[in-house]
């Protein structure tokens, strides 16, 4: 999604009204219920969220010049920096060490990288197809990517071949380096 | 409640991912200067424990010795590549030059055009804005004859611009970059000033 992304892709910037800001926050909480207790710490009431509309109908939400979450269609997707602050709240899967290199260069995640000894998938029933997951790596504390499941986690386990997770956002991609000024 | 994650000042990743960034050497230096605790945790006392460390790494990794070795090799190669690229870029930066040109418009009016800045990762638009407010004049970015971006400042501010760009480059650690000043109005200049010779600079040439 962010393979190519630069300032030229920005169409408009606008400040978000505080009422809409409130709905945004409640939407985030409804998507990730565990965020509820820390949401006011993550996004203080007084902070000013800015909406940046970009190419391909991507919308970024920033606070103080830092991208906190973004939206392509309906669902709000947190950015990695936002995830790092409170990683417990999101559905997480883990890849093995061998896969890190490829993930960091923006590849989709293949099933074997998730099912091998170093990888970790949740027990059944797991996560649905098309849901967003945080991708962690073996022996690492922080998430390195955010992806969208191309098949459900149970399917990944049984099929164990081909693309399992579509890459949305990873460490070092243009969104990660994105800087408003 | 919230976690504070340190990000590497060199590669911007969380430090545990520095090994994959291809800039490991500089990352290590940065981390050892900025966060000794984390450095010790990640890289240990490498000098006397390198062997133990390697064994440790293998033990804690699940992908097997052969693959780990391959990975290590790949990472080394990536690092070498990255270093080469950086060196090349630096050489390119050092060998390129900034051209500051003063051109005459009508009678006693001048513009100053600066080109060749894009190599140095300077945001032209922003710099133009700075100049505009610094000199209280009009300033914009436009394409020149060679289809390259240049900053055009209205008004005779050649010397000030030169000084400012010198300090700007110095800040970036690029002190030895050449600045070429083309001034079509000076008498002493050799007549090789191509482009502007046909402008109406008769005033000064008398």
From Swiss-Prot, chain B:
NCBIfam families: DRP1. It is found in: Cytoplasm. The SUI1 domain may be involved in RNA binding. PROSITE patterns: SUI1. Residues 184-206 are annotated as: Disordered. CDD domains: DENR_C. GO terms for cellular component: cytoplasm; ribonucleoprotein complex; ribosome. This is Translation machinery-associated protein 22. Keywords: Cytoplasm, Ribonucleoprotein, Ribosomal protein. The keyword Lyase does not apply. Residues 196-206 have a biased composition (Low complexity). Interacts with the 40S ribosomal subunit. Residues 98-169 form the SUI1 domain. It comes from the Eukaryota. GO terms for biological process: formation of translation preinitiation complex; nuclear-transcribed mRNA catabolic process, nonsense-mediated decay; ribosome disassembly; translation reinitiation. One of its GO terms (molecular function) is translation initiation factor activity. Belongs to the DENR family.
